[in-house]
Amino acid sequence: MGGQFDLTLTDIPYGEVNRSSNGLRNLDKEDADILTFNLQDFLKKIYEVTKSTIIIFCGKEQMSEIHKFFSEKQKKGKGTVRQLVWKKTNPSPMNGQNIYLSGIENAVWFKKRGGTFNAHCKNTVFEYPCGRNKLHPTEKNHELLRELIRDNSNEGDIVFDPCCGSGAHCLVAKEENRNYIGVELKNQYYEIAKERLQ
């Protein structure tokens, strides 16, 4: 299968993403990371460095491009792609007085052929509340992360998060006896992650 990391589990920036159309799209998610990167280059590199499974939380605007990338791999017999949905049991009412509340977050899941999957006949919809004591504005529910890590890796495996934020994915990986590597560009969040992982 190749690659250095058993599981890549990440939450990419929902800010500005340089899309394959060579245009810059402002995805406008308040308080999200603002970082410009080339999504196609990112996907190619993540695919290359991951041995088994890739899970990418993303904005709805990024979903189709990410899903298409992995669908092409699936067509070539290199793995299986699915859309995962985190259904929030307590969505934030922010700006929801006169519109529907956004009660879900999307992720794309891709398992390389022969990769680890410790669940059986599991649904792609996960129901968990939003965390209220977050150290990063887009931090995911730790029990959701725990379920994903247990389903898609084994103890002693390496979990990689190239968009580490405040280190929640790494923290849960550590709690589940996985090794972890996290990368974060913003010094403020790097320091938070370093402290919580000590």
Label for each model-derived stretch:
Residues 1-182, 186-191:
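Core catalytic lobe of class I
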